[in-house]
Amino acid sequence: MKFIKLLALVLSFQCFAQSQELHLSQNVVLDVPLSKTILHTGNILIFKFGDSHVSHEVLSPKEFFSPIDLTGVEKEFVRSLFKLTENSLFPQWLNAASNELSETLGITKDNKVIEVKGGLDILGFYDSESQSGQVFILDTSLIHHFTFLGSDELFKNLYQSIREKNNEFNN
């Protein structure tokens, strides 16, 4: 019986050692599997897992959908890609741009996932045919953007691990 308890304890440590917390902002944290390769260039952080990779960037409203400067409407624009806002609030040309980008990205009602965790809106989609997906996390003042290339299991695991930070650093 002691052996089983010891084995369970050792295995539980191994599970915890398989990922690390990535603190994206004062409000957002997620568990990322251990990666042998982590690259950082400019505003992009890339994690490589064998044949899969995940990249993260903080969206710039001036650069996200170039040449349109989305400053002031960036969150509404991202929501509109997932058909969560009334596009009629946008000028006709911006509504058309939103619909075009949503279609280009391949966001459909069947492949999108939408969740609210605390003060975070988490919007994502995954295309199993191309084995790629994207996630947008709408934080209080930032929009985090993840791009996934790899299995739907990696996408689901990372998507489900996104959570609002309980401000453990601010106590």
Label the predicted regions:
Residues F3-Q14:
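Sec-dependent N-terminal signal peptides
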